[in-house]
């Protein structure tokens, strides 16, 4: 976390002015101790955030940027987020620990990326389907007891951060396949990329599951390391170029019907902020929650229509 302050301007003060200035500075310093993020001289605080997404044409990085912009606007420029793409400081899998240790002030990823540390992570993003939608999960998180369980899980994992959530994602497609799948037996032995709770379920169904970062999925399909893959949605998938390596895009699936972004914030950095700035970080997540969801509904549909030439409804007799 970086605090900046503007240099003092003007002439060298007289002795009388010096003592008056010193007294005023002492009072200001006392106030600054009470509210440490109010940088002296009208400056601002900058928090370093790394996302799990590449920069450029990537809708998830764009959404992380939307959140950062809202924080800047809500604070009147006194609180800024220095957003960095994946790999700028650490790997995707290292974001949680980097935020906890203070290497980063903030992160932008999903809880499925720390599922390997504790399967309970799936409850906050890739949990069992046929229940709550992603919007309902976020309601449970804030008003149904989910946050207490989330914070308990963070402590067990060893993550030392405060977390907020935004962007309730629509149910995700089953993904891209090199061959058309019409029955359950078609997926047996298939090398498939996914994350979270789905890794266990699909392994039990006979698939060979690979957990790969988003940027490695398309090259892995191209070289044959995997036969099929899911990432998230038509927009992000097309930005990775998945339509260039597969012509079969299966939509409805069970595996991720309730995911959302997690924004981890280093506890020390968070506690050093004023209550007003803490509230901005939280409420900007709520604002981005609505804005990003509206954006997704339009963008995902538009991008799906660009490469979907033929839609076939599955038969209820398929098994």
Residue ranges and their predicted role:
Residues 2, 10-137, 149-313, 317-319:
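N-terminal secretory/targeting leader peptides
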């Amino acid at each position: 976390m970086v605090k900046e302050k503007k240099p003092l301007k003007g002439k060298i003060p007289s002795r009388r002015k010096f003592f008056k200035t010193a007294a005023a500075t002492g009072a200001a310093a006392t106030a600054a101790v009470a509210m440490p993020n109010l940088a002296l001289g009208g400056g601002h605080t900058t928090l370093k955030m790394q996302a799990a997404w590449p920069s450029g044409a990537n809708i998830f990085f764009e959404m992380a940027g939307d959140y950062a912009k809202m924080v800047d606007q809500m604070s009147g420029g006194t609180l800024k987020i220095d957003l960095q793409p994946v790999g700028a400081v650490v790997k995707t899998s290292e974001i949680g620990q980097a935020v906890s240790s203070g290497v980063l002030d903030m992160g932008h990823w999903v809880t499925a990326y720390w599922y390997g540390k504790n399967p309970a992570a799936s409850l906050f993003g890739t949990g069992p389907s046929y229940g709550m939608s992603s919007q309902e999960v976020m309601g449970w998180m804030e008003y149904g007891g989910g946050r207490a369980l989330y914070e308990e899980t963070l402590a067990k994992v060893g993550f030392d951060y405060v977390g907020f959530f935004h962007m309730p994602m629509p149910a995700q497609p089953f993904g891209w396949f090199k061959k058309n799948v019409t029955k359950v037996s078609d997926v047996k032995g298939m090398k498939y990329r996914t994350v979270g709770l789905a890794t266990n379920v699909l392994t039990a169904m006979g698939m060979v599951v690979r957990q790969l970062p988003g940027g490695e999925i398309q090259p892995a399909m191209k070289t044959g390391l995997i036969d099929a893959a899911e990432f998230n949605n038509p927009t992000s998938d097309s930005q990775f170029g998945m339509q260039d390596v597969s012509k079969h895009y299966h939509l409805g699936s069970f595996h991720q019907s309730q995911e959302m972004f997690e924004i981890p914030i280093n506890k020390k950095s968070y506690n050093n902020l004023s209550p007003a700035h803490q509230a901005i970080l939280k409420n900007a997540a709520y604002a981005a929650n609505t804005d990003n969801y509206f954006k997704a509904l339009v963008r995902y549909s538009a991008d799906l229509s660009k490469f979907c030439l033929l839609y076939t409804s599955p038969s209820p007799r398929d098994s």
